[in-house]
């Protein structure tokens, strides 16, 4: 089951620098009279800009909230670093109430982020337009451009994301985080060694104890584009060690790292390793602090991964049982489960395609996420097997032209590029 994870949204929600750092243009007026609150806010923002996460940020968030309980942006930031997601949402909603009496910039920013903060951010794209307007009215506010860049990345609009990050760097001060996202744009441009060199340079500037998500996953993607599976996995294993050492695994389970390793193994024919990684990742869920509905979602993702792995193993009956389990979970989830139907059709299409039932696979694959390059890859394979060459070629072209920022593009792009040149 696939969806923008809460971790991505938390990271996207927390970027900023001192308003006084803006080189030109109007920026937010902070609605607090507490110098201590401003100091703590800047310290927390600086840590995030340097990929410093974990318990120290949680404590900073608590101190920030206590230093001025009526400071809307301070409470907002406290909500971002709060590991208990129910409490984080409660704090965010409180910041919205406080924002009604805050400055125009603070109020509009906090309200614009509602789509990225509630319901696990499933409608995060709706936050983009109000932030664009906010950026036009406050051209010197770096925070807005950093958030826009990440939301554009999440929406598969890499060029717009890069423009936003460049604006943020121009406003200043320059940061490792923005540089890492710009290195990610080099990947979309096909400049893999250059992107790795940028990541390595950025890493050297980081303080000890940093946990550079964007760097480790970016390096992984660069190796996937070049077909170097072992190097791709090595980067994620390094990140797993850093994630644990920082205590982040006590805030959000390490399952997403294992699932990424599982998927890389799966799509490169390392099926036993894939199954073990999916199962190992899920072990971090039952005793975690996640709300029960999110634990259920991750259980669904385990069944999803097992289904695809079993299908690749040729165990088609077992695979379909897993697919039916996912389908039942979605139905049982009622209204909340409806968002996962595209993920189910991707799964069913995957299983049917592996079983040689291409016509049935196509029926499902036409109902998947058309913005997901890997879903599109399966659709292209189905079209090609059915002799529908023009439609296959169009699908492969769509993958090559995609600007999706996640793991799906590096998994799909090499095959799509090769097929596009040979069909």
Segments (PLM) and residue ranges:
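"A position-specific structural signal for the A-helix of alpha-solenoid helical repeats
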Residues: 42, 77, 110-114, 147, ...
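Residue at a conserved register position within TPR or TPR-like alpha-solenoid repeats
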Residues: 47-48, 75, 82, 115, ...
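Solenoid-like repeat scaffolds
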Residues: 62-67, 96-102, 132-138, 167-174, ...
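Alpha-helical adaptor scaffolds
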Residues: 110-118, 149-150, 331-370
């Amino acid at each position: 089951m696939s969806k923008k994870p809460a971790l991505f949204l938390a990271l996207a929600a927390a970027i900023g620098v001192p308003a006084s750092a803006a080189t030109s243009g109007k920026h937010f007026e902070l609605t607090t009279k507490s110098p201590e609150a401003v100091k703590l806010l800047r310290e927390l923002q600086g840590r995030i800009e340097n990929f410093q996460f974990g318990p120290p940020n949680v404590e900073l968030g608590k101190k920030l909230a206590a230093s001025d309980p009526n400071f809307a942006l301070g409470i907002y930031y406290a909500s971002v670093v709060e590991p208990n997601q129910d409490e984080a949402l409660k704090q965010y909603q409180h910041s919205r109430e406080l924002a009604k009496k805050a400055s125009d910039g603070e109020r509009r920013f906090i309200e614009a982020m509602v789509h990225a903060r509630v319901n696990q951010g499933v409608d995060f794209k709706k936050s983009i337009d109000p932030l664009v307007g906010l950026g036009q009215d406050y051209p010197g506010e770096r925070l807005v451009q950093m958030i826009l860049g990440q939301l554009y990345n999440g929406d598969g609009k890499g060029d717009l994301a890069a423009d936003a990050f460049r604006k943020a760097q121009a406003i200043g001060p320059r940061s490792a985080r923005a540089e890492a996202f710009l290195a990610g744009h080099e990947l979309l441009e096909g400049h893999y060694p250059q992107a790795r060199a940028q990541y390595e340079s950025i890493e050297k500037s980081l303080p000890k104890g940093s946990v550079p998500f964007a760097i480790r996953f970016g390096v992984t993607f660069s190796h996937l584009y070049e077909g170097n599976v072992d190097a791709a996995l090595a980067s994620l294993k390094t990140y797993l060690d850093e994630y644990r050492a920082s205590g982040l695994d006590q805030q959000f389970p390490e399952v997403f790292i294992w699932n990424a390793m599982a998927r890389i193994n799966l799509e490169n024919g390392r099926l036993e390793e894939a199954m073990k990684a999916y199962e190992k990742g899920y072990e971090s869920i039952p005793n975690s602090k996640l709300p029960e509905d999110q634990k259920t979602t991750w259980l669904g993702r385990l069944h999803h991964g097992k289904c695809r792995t079993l299908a690749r193993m040729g165990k088609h009956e077992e695979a379909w049982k897993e697919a039916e389990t996912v389908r039942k979970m979605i139905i049982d989830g009622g209204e909340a489960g409806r968002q996962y139907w595209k993920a189910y059709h991707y799964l069913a299409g995957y299983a049917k395609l592996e079983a040689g039932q291409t016509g049935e696979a196509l029926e499902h694959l036409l109902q998947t996420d058309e913005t997901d390059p890997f879903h599109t890859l399966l659709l292209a394979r189905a079209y090609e097997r059915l002799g529908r060459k023009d439609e296959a070629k169009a699908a492969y072209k769509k993958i090559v032209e995609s600007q999706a920022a996640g793991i799906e593009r590096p998994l799909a792009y090499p095959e799509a590029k090769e097929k596009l040149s040979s069909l």
